[in-house]
């Protein structure tokens, strides 16, 4: 079974994200559990936690169908000690919020070296940050997202993801979210079935499908290998549709959240229906 949905708004209360997912015909969804553009957020109340858990249970969403995303401010590979510590504290808080809500994943961008330290050192800091967070939480898997490689962002090469995972002590609580637009921008071709076979074989060789915990299903406004992060609707842009057909027909992508972050929320119901028809 394919779990397909979108990153829906949690405005007005995180339990409303569940209603919005149901409204677009989704059986998966992503959300922010706090304002993603602020460092601090009020603690979750018992009332909020109960409302969210009840909404999920009523709508039939299991934890493995939900892929929460952390704040964009967090940089777990930051070169400066004070800024790194600030990011780590915020990341632990995000993990704890997921734990309170009964969620099993937290999706995040690995971080940036900001041209101040080496890639290797920044990747080491990301892994160390994950280890610290896992020690202080239970039941939540840290899900590293591949990036487009814009600026000094790490995570655009499969080898970056593998290097982080290799240094995480509890391998059972680390995973990867594969973003189709980001991979295309980073130079991983998926424009034909043959391209998909080759790219996902490389993913299996370098990272491993056992670590794949979710996907972001996005078209690409950016050009191939441009290292620029620009999403598009599924049937528009430069990526084409072969990869979406490939994903929908391959059982390796079953039972993980397949999350739209495409540019027009008005057509999310149509895009979800279209993806289901491909399978």
UniProtKB/Swiss-Prot annotation:
Residues that span the membrane, as ranges: none
Entries under PROSITE patterns matching the protein: AP_NUCLEASE_F2_1 (PS00729), AP_NUCLEASE_F2_2 (PS00730), AP_NUCLEASE_F2_3 (PS00731), AP_NUCLEASE_F2_4 (PS51432)
Keyword tags: DNA damage, DNA repair, Endonuclease, Hydrolase, Metal-binding, Nuclease, Zinc
Top enzyme class: hydrolase
Enzyme Commission number: 3.1.21.2
Cofactor binding comment, as recorded: Binds 3 Zn(2+) ions.
PANTHER family: APURINIC-APYRIMIDINIC ENDONUCLEASE (PTHR21445:SF0), ENDONUCLEASE IV ENDODEOXYRIBONUCLEASE IV (PTHR21445)
HAMAP family: Nfo
This protein's name: Probable endonuclease 4
């Amino acid at each position: 079974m394919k779990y397909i949905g979108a990153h829906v708004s949690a405005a007005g209360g995180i339990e409303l994200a569940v209603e919005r997912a149901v409204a677009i015909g989704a059986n998966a969804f992503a959300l922010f559990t706090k304002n993603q553009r602020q460092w601090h957020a009020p603690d979750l109340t018992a009332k909020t936690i109960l409302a969210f858990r009840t909404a999920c249970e009523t709508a039939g969403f299991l934890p493995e169908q939900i892929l929460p995303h952390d704040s964009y401010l967090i940089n777990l590979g930051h070169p400066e000690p004070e800024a790194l510590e600030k990011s780590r504290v915020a990341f632990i808080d995000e993990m704890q919020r997921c734990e309170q809500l009964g969620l099993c994943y937290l999706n995040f961008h690995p971080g940036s070296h900001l041209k101040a330290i080496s890639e290797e050192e920044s990747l080491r800091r990301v892994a160390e940050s994950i280890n610290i967070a896992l020690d202080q939480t239970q039941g939540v898997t840290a899900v590293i997202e591949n990036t487009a490689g814009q600026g000094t962002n790490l995570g655009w090469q499969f080898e970056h993801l593998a290097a982080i995972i290799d240094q995480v002590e509890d391998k059972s609580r680390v995973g990867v979210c594969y973003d189709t637009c980001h991979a295309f921008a980073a130079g991983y071709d998926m424009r034909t079935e043959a391209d998909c076979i080759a790219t996902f074989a490389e993913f299996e060789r370098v990272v491993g499908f056992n670590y794949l915990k979710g996907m972001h299903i996005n078209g690409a406004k950016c050009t191939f290998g441009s290292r620029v992060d620009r999403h598009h609707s599924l049937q528009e842009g430069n990526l084409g549709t072969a990869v979406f057909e490939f994903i929908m027909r391959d059982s390796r992508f079953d039972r993980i959240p397949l999350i739209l972050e495409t540019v027009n929320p008005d057509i999310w119901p149509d895009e979800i229906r279209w993806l289901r028809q491909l399978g």
